[in-house]
């Protein structure tokens, strides 16, 4: 069973959804037969590098709310993260462009380090408050994932390397009508949108395992719940 996951490294629900999927796979009897592949998706391909404006300030400006209201909104997401053992430091996050991070993740996949790189990039942004567009930071992250500095610099210093791989992933998402992430595709036939509860993922895995081949392409197993996902404009805030 192959699961393809479209996500962005600055999408909080992508990290939460990743953890919930991992929990579901751990509970799944056929877990040894499950392969997970991460796909690139930029929430904002035109995003600038970090300018000093934090996530709470950016959110407040976007929605016309106070900083305190923005903080409370993010606290709700942080609570969901905590439920799966994650710590989100919204006060220190540095929103930025993620294209180079995606290129580096694509390279990591070619040397068998996709899983490690994906986790390190997400943790670096959400928990460690690192600037994941900065090349020095990316070199450091790659080293912790087991990739040599020289290899990383060879990718980062040539903006064409793995750029097409990222664009292909994004084009595939567009063809499927994906407008928000995380977005999960199982065996190129079934889809799950958003950071669904662990039990939803577990049931989906079991259903696909039992019914593989009997369902139409990209059958939606999200249960009608389209919340807990980020679009190219925002991460939805209930009531706004």
Model-assigned labels for residue ranges:
Residues 1-5, 37-38:
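Short, well-ordered beta-strand elements
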Residues 5-7, 13-30, 106-110, 116-240:
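C-terminal cap of thioredoxin/glutaredoxin-like
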Residues 19-125, 235-236:
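Structural alpha/beta surface segment adjacent to cysteine/selenocysteine redox centers
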């Amino acid at each position: 069973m192959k699961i393809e996951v479209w996500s962005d490294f600055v999408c909080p629900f992508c990290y939460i959804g990743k953890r919930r999927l991992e929990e579901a796979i751990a509970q799944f009897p056929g877990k040894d037969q499950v392969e997970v592949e991460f796909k690139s998706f930029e929430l904002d391909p035109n995003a600038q590098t970090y300018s000093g404006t934090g996530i709470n300030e950016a959110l407040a400006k976007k929605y016309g709310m106070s900083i305190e209201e923005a903080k409370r909104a993010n606290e709700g997401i942080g609570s969901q993260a905590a439920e799966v053992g994650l710590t989100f430091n919204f006060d220190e996050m540095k929103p930025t462009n993620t294209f180079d991070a995606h290129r580096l993740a694509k390279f990591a996949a070619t040397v068998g380090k996709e899983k490690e790189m994906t986790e390190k990039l997400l943790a670096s942004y959400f928990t460690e408050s690192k600037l994941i567009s900065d090349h020095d930071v990316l070199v450091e992250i790659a080293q912790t994932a087991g990739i040599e500095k020289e290899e990383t610099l060879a990718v980062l210093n040539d903006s064409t390397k793995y750029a097409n791989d990222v664009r292909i992933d994004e084009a595939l998402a567009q063809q499927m009508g994906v407008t928000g992430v995380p977005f999960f595709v199982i065996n190129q036939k079934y889809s799950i949108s958003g950071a669904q509860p662990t039990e939803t993922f577990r049931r989906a895995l079991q259903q696909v395992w039992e019914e593989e081949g009997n369902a139409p392409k990209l059958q939606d197993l999200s249960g009608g719940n389209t919340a807990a996902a980020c679009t190219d404009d925002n991460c939805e805030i209930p009531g706004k």
